[in-house]
Amino acid sequence: PELTPQQLLRYVPAISSLCRVDCKSLFSLDSTNITPAHWITVAQALRDNYAHYDGFVISHGTDTMAYTAAALSYLVQGADKPIMITGAQKPINYDSTDSKLNLTDAFVCACSGQLAGVDIVFSGRVILGTRARKTCSKSFAAFSSINYPDLAILHDHRLMRYIAPDTLPAPLFYDKLDEHVALVKMVPGTDPEVL
């Protein structure tokens, strides 16, 4: 949360050779504090700027990145432009950071013309936003795609797409979420009274 988007990009000057980047900072907070109201703010910013850009890259903390990717997938349905979400396990100013790789890869994906919709770009993988889950807090390969293959992989900042994105003739933007929804995992022996 302490770096501005412009400061982040200064660590990765190669991105400027990929595309022209305009930065917008919607909020700066630890991702553990994100709420559905923040997701709606991001979706509204995407809607307001959708016609002006070819793609979007969102820098995000890893603790709730998968939740944000899923929420945005439902708030911005059928997007025909890439909306790439990325972050890092280690801060960008560390020698051993994964931030520079992930940020560059996210911009490669956003500029490729091969991807669309909300995806997580992390550790050389492109994961569909509704299928991503953080499965490891200690590894650079922190995210997994649950019950669905990766959309693409990246090697040396080259994209190799496996699955074509699903798009609609025009994206559908939503601006409401019901915050009174709970995820209840059923296990054998669960008392029906719980529901």
Give short role names for the model-derived ranges.
Residues 1, 63-69, 99-103:
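Short glycine/serine/threonine-rich phosphate/pyrophosphate-binding segments
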Residues 1-47:
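ATP/NTP phosphate-donor binding region
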Residues 54-55:
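Structural motif
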Residues 59-81:
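Short Gly/Thr/Asp-enriched flexible loops that form oxyanion-binding sites at enzyme active sites
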